[in-house]
């Protein structure tokens, strides 16, 4: 939580109480959404904090849906970190140890198992849609893809989840 204090202290004085409330409201949802998207909590909190830091320097009046904007920025940050980690693994660079206890507990949750069965794109769009209420048009703009692709991807993801539910 130390990073939370740093983020709040850099917020301009006039809006700090409002910004603190938004952080408290959105941060847990963003962490859950990114973990659901990625299928892991590794790197998620860092990506969320980086997204909030980016929001501090962004023109927030130009952001229609702060939760969706933060999710998109955090997802891109997480993807970059995952690519760097993949390169480090390929080069066999040492990596800091991660506690596996939380990871094992999270992986036992049916929802994460179901989401893991989806493609990355399906997972990202479905989580953004249901955690942050982004419309298909907003998803298309945020993810730089045609609206029809968004619609088809969401339908395919929902069908896969329904099929998994029927097999339980």
Spans of model-derived segments:
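Structural recognition of an alpha-helix C-terminal capping motif at a helix-to-coil junction
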Residues: 46-53, 57, 64-76
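Internal acidic/polar
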Residues: 5, 80, 88-115, 135
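Arg/Lys-rich amphipathic alpha helix in sigma70-family domain 2
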Residues: 61, 65, 72-93, 103-104, ...
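DNA-recognition helix of helix-turn-helix
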Residues: 75, 79, 137, 143-168
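A short, charge-rich alpha-helical start-of-domain segment used by transcription regulators
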Residues: 2-32, 42, 61, 123
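A short pre-motif secondary-structure segment
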Residues: 125-129
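C-terminal flanking helix
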Residues: 27, 31, 52, 119, ...
